């Protein structure tokens, strides 16, 4: 992609002929990446019947408009940042267009940092930064275009990302498994089946019935109820059906809707690899309920647990707190602080971020790790995202049990 003369310098991907779901557009740069990492990623996506597009055109300039149309027809974009990503102005132009479609709620972006640290991209440092400024010197873009390039880079870096650090021991094949899992999770939100046919849904409205069940009562006064949640009709949309879901109501709190997102419904890096995590049934469960599983960290050099929740299910004008429910066996590998992050729907508000010392949470009882707080209002209707992660320490961590995330009123 450092010019229009060779296939090796092309920024993106190949076409799968399996028309089974939303198209996935892959934006990347580099001959080495194409022959190495992409040789694992593309077949893995196709194996799961995921429709993938990778641009193979040699003469990029002639096909750029058509390529932009293809991006617009896609539902998911995988933006794969590597050290050589900024060697191509085609890649940067693609990224700008991808961001535009994301801002229009027409595209969901999954940023992937391949053998690259997030801060290197955000701060434009290291070889990645050198390549970016070399690109600027070479093409001398207009100030407006340069602003679009940097704005696209910084905006994408703020999204929930999959990161393979530069010196990580995790193999490309294992990293690909996490990417495929993330794509499949996003795909599930795009469609529902009616009479055997798939119908694509708008991103702003959940596509299927949501069931949120907390398997353990918060206290002796709590009871489980089933309710219907009537969604308001959004502008330029057809009436939206009611959605039935379950949650616990704490009778000691008049407004006490307590939501619990199980570990199985969170995104946990490497959780399907038995070398890193194992899934265990939660002890002392009610035999009449479906089995709830907890995740146990056996061994991993980095931690990444994240999830999302739609605030439309919450009580309006109520202060809520978000907490991870965990317990930790005694172990010395947790000497590096673990980071917590809460992103609210109103993008103009900065994410809530903090760090915690996991030694404070060593216990044989379930403990809450606070992530952040927010008040429900018309201004922040939409999806919140939360994460607990540690990507910097190369020590192999273990001994962490993850039960889930609780979202509850704070009084």
UniProtKB/Swiss-Prot annotation:
Checking InterPro entries in the record gives:
PP2-like, PP2-like/Lectin, TIR_dom, Toll_tir_struct_dom_sf
Q: Name one GO cellular component term.
A: nucleus
Species for this entry: Arabidopsis thaliana (Mouse-ear cress)
Please state what the protein is called. Answer: Protein PHLOEM PROTEIN 2-LIKE A5
Domain remark from Swiss-Prot or TrEMBL: The TIR domain mediates NAD(+) hydrolase (NADase) activity. Self-association of TIR domains is required for NADase activity.
Impact noted for substituting residue 89 to R: In strain: cv. An-2, cv. Bs-1, cv. Bu-0, cv. Chi-1, cv. Co-1, cv. Cvi-0, cv. El-0, cv. Gr-3, cv. Ita-0, cv. Jl-3, cv. Kas-1, cv. Landsberg erecta, cv. Lisse-2, cv. Lu-1, cv. Pi-0 and cv. Sf-1
Q: What is the effect of changing residue 116 to I?
A: In strain: cv. An-2, cv. Bs-1, cv. Bu-0, cv. Chi-1, cv. Co-1, cv. Cvi-0, cv. El-0, cv. Gr-3, cv. Ita-0, cv. Jl-3, cv. Kas-1, cv. Landsberg erecta, cv. Lisse-2, cv. Lu-1, cv. Pi-0 and cv. Sf-1
Q: What does the UniProt record report as the effect of altering residue 167 to N in this chain?
A: In strain: cv. An-2, cv. Bs-1, cv. Bu-0, cv. Chi-1, cv. Co-1, cv. Cvi-0, cv. El-0, cv. Gr-3, cv. Ita-0, cv. Jl-3, cv. Kas-1, cv. Landsberg erecta, cv. Lisse-2, cv. Lu-1, cv. Pi-0 and cv. Sf-1
- Reported impact of residue 188 to R: In strain: cv. An-2, cv. Bs-1, cv. Bu-0, cv. Chi-1, cv. Co-1, cv. Cvi-0, cv. El-0, cv. Gr-3, cv. Ita-0, cv. Jl-3, cv. Landsberg erecta, cv. Lisse-2, cv. Lu-1, cv. Pi-0 and cv. Sf-1
Which chemical reaction does it catalyze?
NAD(+) + H2O = ADP-D-ribose + nicotinamide + H(+)
Q: Domain of life here?
A: Eukaryota
MF annotations from Gene Ontology: carbohydrate binding; NAD+ nucleosidase activity, cyclic ADP-ribose generating
- State which Enzyme Commission number(s) the record gives: 3.2.2.6
Record domain TIR: where: 20-157
What does the record list as GO biological process?
defense response to insect; jasmonic acid mediated signaling pathway; response to jasmonic acid stimulus involved in jasmonic acid and ethylene-dependent systemic resistance; salicylic acid mediated signaling pathway
State the active site.
94
Under the heading PROSITE patterns, the entry gives:
TIR
Give the UniProt keywords, A-Z: Hydrolase, NAD
Annotated consequence of substituting residue 42 to T = In strain: cv. An-2, cv. Bs-1, cv. Bu-0, cv. Chi-1, cv. Co-1, cv. Cvi-0, cv. El-0, cv. Gr-3, cv. Ita-0, cv. Jl-3, cv. Kas-1, cv. Landsberg erecta, cv. Lisse-2, cv. Lu-1, cv. Pi-0 and cv. Sf-1
């Amino acid at each position: 992609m450092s010019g229009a003369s060779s296939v090796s310098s092309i920024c993106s991907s190949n076409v799968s002929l399996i028309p089974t779901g939303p198209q996935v557009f892959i934006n990347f740069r580099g001959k080495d990446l194409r022959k190495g990492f992409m040789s694992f990623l593309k077949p893995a996506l196709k194996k799961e019947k995921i429709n993938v597009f990778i641009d193979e055109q040699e003469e990029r300039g002639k096909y750029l408009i058509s390529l932009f149309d293809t991006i617009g027809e896609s539902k998911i974009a995988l933006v794969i940042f590597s050290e050589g990503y900024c060697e191509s102005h085609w890649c940067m132009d693609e990224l700008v267009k991808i961001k535009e479609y994301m801002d229009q709620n027409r595209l969901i972006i999954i940023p992937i940092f391949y053998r690259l640290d997030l801060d290197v991209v955000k701060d434009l440092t290291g070889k990645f930064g050198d390549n970016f400024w070399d690109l600027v010197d070479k093409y001398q873009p207009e100030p407006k275009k340069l602003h679009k390039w940097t704005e696209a880079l910084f905006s994408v870096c703020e999204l929930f990302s999959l990161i393979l650090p530069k010196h990580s021991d995790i193999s490309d094949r294992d990293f690909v498994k996490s990417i495929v899992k993330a794509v499949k999770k996003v795909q599930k939100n795009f469609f529902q089946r009616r009479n055997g046919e798939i119908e694509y849904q708008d991103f702003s409205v959940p596509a299927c019935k949501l069931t949120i069940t907390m398997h353990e009562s918060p206290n002796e006064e709590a009871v489980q109820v089933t309710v219907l949640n009537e969604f308001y009709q959004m502008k330029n949309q057809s009436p939206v059906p009611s959605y039935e879901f379950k949650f616990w109501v704490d009778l000691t709190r008049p407004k006490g809707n307590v939501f619990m997102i199980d570990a199985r419904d969170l995104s946990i890096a490497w959780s399907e690899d038995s070398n890193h995590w194992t899934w265990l049934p939660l002890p002392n469960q009610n035999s009449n309920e479906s089995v709830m599983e907890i995740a146990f960290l056996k061994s991993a050099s980095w931690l990444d647990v994240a999830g999302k929740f739609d605030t439309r299910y919450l009580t309006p004008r109520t202060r809520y707190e978000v907490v991870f429910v965990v317990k930790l066996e005694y172990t010395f590998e947790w000497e590096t602080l673990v980071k917590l992050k809460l992103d609210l729907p109103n993008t103009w508000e900065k994410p809530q971020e903090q760090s915690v010392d996991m030694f404070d949470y060593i216990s044989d009882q379930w403990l809450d790790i606070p992530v952040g707080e927010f008040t429900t209002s018309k201004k922040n209707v939409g999806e919140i995202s939360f994460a607990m992660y540690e990507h910097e320490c190369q020590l192999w961590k273990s001994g962490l049990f993850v039960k889930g995330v609780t979202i509850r009123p704070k009084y």
